[in-house]
Amino acid sequence: MRFLFFLFVAVVHLFSLGSGKAIYKSGVSQRTFQEIKEEIANYEDVAKAIINLAVYGKYQNRSYERLGLLVDTVGPRLSGSKNLEKAIQIMYQNLQQDGLENVHLEQVRIPHWERGEESAVMVVPRIHKLAILGLGGSIGTPPEGITAEVLVVASFVELQRRASEARGKIVVYNQPYTDYGKTVQYRERGAVEAAKVGAVASLIRSVASFSIYSPHTGHQGYQDGVPKIPTACITIEDAEMMSRMASRGDKIVIHLKMGAKTYPDTDSFNTVAEITGSKYPEEVVLVSGHLDSWDVGQGALDDGGGAFISWEALSLVKDLGLRPKRTLRLVLWTAEEQGGVGASQYYELHKANISKYSLVMEADSGTFLPTGLQFTGSDKARAIMKEVMSLLQPLNITKVFNDAEGTDINFWIQAGVPGASLRDDLYKYFFFHHSHGDTMTAMDPKQMNVAAAVWAVVAYVVADMEEMLPRS
């Protein structure tokens, strides 16, 4: 009988979500899904107030103007740079002046790499200066540079097939762009795979959906036991040109010179501000973006926009005189571009309280006009998030997609905390990503207003609901 009872409970649990009779537990309380739907529906007026203030009202364009002031003043914010630390101190002051609570800096250790002077020139079959951007963490060349013949390949499979041709050469990858997740492996692993077959350097076709002769930088990693070789990204145009030349049987020779250096790790800070919860202050909805960037462009899109709509979300809640039941916590991460370095240390520092995190949110895919929210969590939590997103019907942004994305929140998501990220126009995003084109010109104030409204509504409602989002 005991077994049959538990079997009955399991069956009811499995089928009840669609019927509106799912049981959620918070302490000793039991609530049906219908009751939760009704609770969320009661936030309609609050959601409209947030939308009106952000998109049509007094504070429209505020996140855009705040962002422009920072990036025009400071510029790009590479991990380990003085620019990044200047930006952190400015944001620390800004958040205090904005009237947010518990504003503080949490110290972390981060990498310090500088690209130095760099150049690449094709000297055979003709003289042609290549636009390049060294990849983060790359070693430099000898002072005199490297002059070597080129081997062009379209994939790692082709590289292995032609391994006997690679020794002493510069491997040029002309991999096709499918999507970022699949194509970025060439940037991440290109140098290692080339070094394994004896190459002296690697040049990788930029991981981008479109190019107007623009190289795109990014993170790459070396592997223990494999020689380190210099590595950089080149433009799509030059990669395709060299592929055509090679297919005709032309010999290609490049002179590569890179002054990149890695210095000892240095101190930096994650920047934190809150609106303290009124009823469950120890419980948290985390809203975030990263403050660091690469050393090209202004870091406006990646990830100034995400950081500033996250700040704007708390500002909007504060400006409306709202105080959610649980704490809204803003975190502006440092050293995300080096693999979530600041976020990993935040996780280690705070994971003892993991049961108190209802939702972790990160905006790091641009702040163009969002089409919805990407979400990772239990089926119960997803059903709740669909109801929350229905409050954004006035903006026609109500969809909930699978798989929240965010280097900085993945630590929490993998540990079972529900996670959310903006669903954005990634095709357009990769026009500018990690390039000199990542400037305020890529930003649209009206689209930032909408993104901030979506972010604020979701964060506030989840933070103010009577119960935390249920986990698996």
Swiss-Prot record:
N-glycosylated. The secreted form is modified by hybrid or complex type oligosaccharide chains. Residues 21-44 form a propeptide. One of its GO terms (cellular component) is lysosome. It is found in: Endoplasmic reticulum; Golgi apparatus; Lysosome; Secreted. Glycans are attached at N61, N353, N396. Residues 1-20 form the signal peptide. This is Carboxypeptidase Q. It comes from Rattus norvegicus (Rat).
